[in-house]
């Protein structure tokens, strides 16, 4: 038995194993993933938010350029990251609200600026949210770190070795529209 975090960690290790990648390449294969660790799944989700906004406007539910709030139940941070990308592309979004369950690692991160997976893992009735390592948050961290790959890698290494990392006040200020 295992949980989502354990499975995803194993998958990521396989994806990052250059020797295994070379073996597969020789055989004419490569790894792919259909879950949200694949950016190819996230990018089309941006269109969901544009479409939903257009429908709200067309149906008279909102005025032109009126800001909306987006609430997403999230564990792996993929869908709400797509909303963040839509907002950055100009979609009028006010708040990005991460709905959490008892594991609430994202709620705590947005409240404190420290991502800490060192806690009890709680099995709930929402297993897709039973996650302590929200892998898509890495993409947001990269963005708010000024697209600094070294800084991003350092924080992800801290998460791997220490189970936590903290963002700077400057980075945290860029997350003012996120609520946990």
Enumerate the language-model features and the residues they cover.
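PLP-dependent amino-acid enzyme catalytic core
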Residues: 1-180
């Amino acid at each position: 038995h295992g949980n989502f975090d354990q499975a995803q960690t194993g998958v990521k290790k396989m994806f990052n194993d250059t020797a295994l990648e070379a073996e597969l390449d020789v055989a004419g294969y490569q790894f792919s993933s259909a879950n949200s660790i694949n950016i190819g799944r996230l990018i089309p989700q941006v269109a969901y938010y544009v479409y939903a906004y257009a429908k709200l406007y067309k149906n008279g539910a909102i005025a032109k350029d009126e800001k909306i709030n987006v609430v997403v139940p999230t564990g792996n941070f993929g869908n709400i990251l797509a909303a963040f990308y839509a907002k950055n592309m100009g979609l009028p979004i006010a708040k990005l609200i991460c709905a959490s369950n008892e594991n609430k690692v994202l709620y705590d991160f947005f409240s404190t600026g420290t991502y800490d997976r060192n806690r009890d893992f709680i099995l709930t009735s929402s297993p897709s949210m039973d996650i302590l390592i929200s892998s898509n948050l890495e993409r947001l961290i990269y963005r708010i770190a000024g697209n600094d790959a070294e800084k991003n890698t350092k924080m992800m290494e801290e998460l791997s070795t220490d189970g936590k990392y903290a963002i700077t006040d400057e980075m945290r200020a860029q997350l003012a529209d996120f609520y946990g």
